[in-house]
């Protein structure tokens, strides 16, 4: 086993606990970013390109007939063999958390429709379910079993929000274990059936699941109701005759106590369990090798990797399976440093030789790691954009000239600035306020001095006023500079001078009226 540190060259902030990695014929793709996708990559799926220990995230391309795939963290994912050649390998995605902290109950199917040396084009379709539809959840597992030439999805575990009649303002985001029901999902006809097995008494989440032919093994997990990580090992076997499916569960010895572990396949019959937690605040540093032979499962400890001091002393870690016996791990950065990364990333190779594609069986584990604060609202929204331009990466030149630093630049300047002392617009919490907003906040230009941009919402502008100002050519001054602008532009009020009309200058004045006494005096004076 070898451990290598990985340097992320761009979009580091997108990689957060709960992401998933999908391996399509040796090419790895990242799914489940933090926040809503931005316009530079509206699909939210990135090519996970690692070369010489440097990771580069490149935007993936979807066909125009694809449905919208929101960024989902802590979903259940598994591979599925389609019937046609174009659907040779598919990924099934169910559940998960959106950036708005909502839980999804939808099923998405991702497949490759075009592949060349430059890029891979995906198609995403949404499947509707009827029957016993599983409730929205996260931290669960989804596997595909094959029996008698048929296939069926097996869904189990996870967490969901409290029922609506029990949710209060103080505990609105409180979660609980889902009922320990096993769901069989027919992806071809969109039917789901729920089964109650007496061996499964408590709900589990963040467990490990391994599918082999007609059998699914459930290992470990965390029970939120009892706050324990039972060392249980269940074997769920599914028989698919012409009639109704038959399902049974057996409790096996030899389980281990672990939650949020990552499972990777090293060869046709062996898997490696990496990471996870054995207590709430204690990571599980031991790795295990799982062997499957003749419908038997054996779990043994294996050589422990040479963990770095940063990994040993970190309180949490997270990651996902890269396929071919490799695991991608992340730990929080050192906040004590003046300039530090938010996360440090590593790649653990559990085998020296890559697994050949023909030897790879389509198995899955619940590889999303557990968030220490998953009972609280732990994620906020980012910029959201989805339009026809999401599928407009038609030319190779345009794909190659993608600005990889656009995500970081936009978060520091442009629409996400602090426009005034009372500005509360945050890239992580912003939601549209005006009807004209879609993927960024509305802004207006202040003409004071050299000019600067301010958010319309921070200026308390009504939508009608905002539209009027945007259509006209009038100058606008923000709340901070409006008084200064008035003092500079509005003259002081002065009393206007009253000028007599010109006609009055030529008008003959009225004669004076003399009293009889004055007339008598003047008469005597001149006499």
Curated annotation (Swiss-Prot):
It comes from the Eukaryota. Residues 359-380 are annotated as: Disordered. Thymus. A zinc finger (PHD-type) spans 416-484. Keywords: Chromatin regulator, DNA recombination, Metal-binding, Nucleus, Zinc, Zinc-finger. Pfam families: RAG2 (PF03089), RAG2_PHD (PF13341). GO terms for molecular function: chromatin binding; histone H3K4me3 reader activity; phosphatidylinositol binding; phosphatidylinositol-3,4,5-trisphosphate binding; phosphatidylinositol-3,4-bisphosphate binding; phosphatidylinositol-3,5-bisphosphate binding; phosphatidylinositol-4,5-bisphosphate binding; sequence-specific DNA binding. SUPFAM superfamilies: FYVE/PHD zinc finger, Galactose oxidase, central domain. CDD domains: PHD_RAG2. The keyword Metal-binding applies. Its main location: nucleus. GO terms for biological process: B cell differentiation; B cell homeostatic proliferation; B cell lineage commitment; defense response to bacterium; DN2 thymocyte differentiation; organ growth; positive regulation of organ growth; pre-B cell allelic exclusion. PANTHER family: V D J RECOMBINATION-ACTIVATING PROTEIN 2, V(D)J RECOMBINATION-ACTIVATING PROTEIN 2. Component of the RAG complex composed of core components RAG1 and RAG2, and associated component HMGB1 or HMGB2. Belongs to the RAG2 family. This is V(D)J recombination-activating protein 2. The lineage of its organism: Eukaryota, Metazoa, Chordata, Craniata, Vertebrata.
